[in-house]
């Protein structure tokens, strides 16, 4: 059951809402425009607020839905987290789009929302605060993501290992942004 749900979560995660919405609207391919990342921030830059909001909702949903299905199936918190991580992996390396995906922040937030909703609050607050001062989405994401870990470790310790791995993957996917930040070349809004 766990493996089947993980495979289905990966396949769901492989749906790139940024790419699909761009194709449906006749807009540019987010992998070829702006930052080249098929995610919410790049969609905001190249396609506007409406498509960016739809991308965000879709990416959140594909992280949330597999966790909720795993909960409904009676699986434990750690199994739910691994299944959520499979959805994030699909977002990062989508089967349907030549394994060229996004950075996983919104999908990870959806996963976390399913695992333990109160842990999302400090992360969202930190993201908004850092973004308000820096106008840099990547820095806000990197600052916000680890803030959910202590609360999650306290309330859902079984999910901590998959979440630590998830954080490592998100940092890895932002390595280009980190280099640009340190070089003073990172894009701002």
UniProtKB/Swiss-Prot annotation:
Question: What EC numbers are recorded for this enzyme?
Answer: 2.3.1.275
Substrates-to-products reaction catalysed? an acyl phosphate + sn-glycerol 3-phosphate = a 1-acyl-sn-glycero-3-phosphate + phosphate
Kindly state the subunit structure of this protein: Probably interacts with PlsX.
Broad class of the protein's primary localization = membrane
Q: Which family does it belong to?
A: Belongs to the PlsY family.
GO CC annotation, single: plasma membrane
Q: Which gene encodes it?
A: plsY
| Name of this chain's protein | Glycerol-3-phosphate acyltransferase
Instruction: Give the organism's phylogenetic lineage.
Output: Bacteria, Pseudomonadati, Pseudomonadota, Gammaproteobacteria, Pseudomonadales
GO BP annotations listed: phospholipid biosynthetic process
From what organism does this protein derive? Azotobacter vinelandii (strain DJ / ATCC BAA-1303)
Pathway entry: Lipid metabolism; phospholipid metabolism
Q: What's its top-level EC category?
A: transferase
Q: How does the record classify its membrane topology? A: Multi-pass membrane protein
Q: Does the keyword Lipid metabolism apply?
A: yes
Q: What does this chain do?
A: Catalyzes the transfer of an acyl group from acyl-phosphate (acyl-PO(4)) to glycerol-3-phosphate (G3P) to form lysophosphatidic acid (LPA). This enzyme utilizes acyl-phosphate as fatty acyl donor, but not acyl-CoA or acyl-ACP.
